[in-house]
């Protein structure tokens, strides 16, 4: 599990899904699941689940892998890198 803290407060599922879709490109299917999570799929065997949590002065994303272990590691790593490098979450 990766934990990414960004200094921007109040990030929504829709914003997160939009940013991940742009950053990851067309090879990934990004969908909010309506339960405070966004699911990123590369194939039926590889997925990453991003949970959104608001904390004072920031938003925390927790990224978990889903699917077969060999495949989920790469997907989770790409999602984590995309979140860490996204300037959209750096400030309001």
Outline where the language-model segments fall:
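A general secondary-structure boundary signal
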Residues: 1-3, 35-37, 57-59, 64, ...
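Short beta-strand element of the conserved SAM-dependent methyltransferase core
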Residues: 2-7, 39-41, 49-52
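A conserved amphipathic terminal alpha-helix motif
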Residues: 68-92
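Short beta-strand-to-loop capping motifs
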Residues: 5-11, 42, 63-65
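Terminal, regulation- and interaction-focused segments at domain boundaries
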Residues: 1-27
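Hydrophobic, Leu/Ile/Phe/Ala-enriched alpha-helical segments that form helix-helix packing faces
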Residues: 20-28, 83-90
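Amphipathic, interaction-prone secondary-structure segments
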Residues: 27-49
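Beta-strand/loop substructures that line and gate deep hydrophobic ligand-binding cavities in soluble
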Residues: 44-77
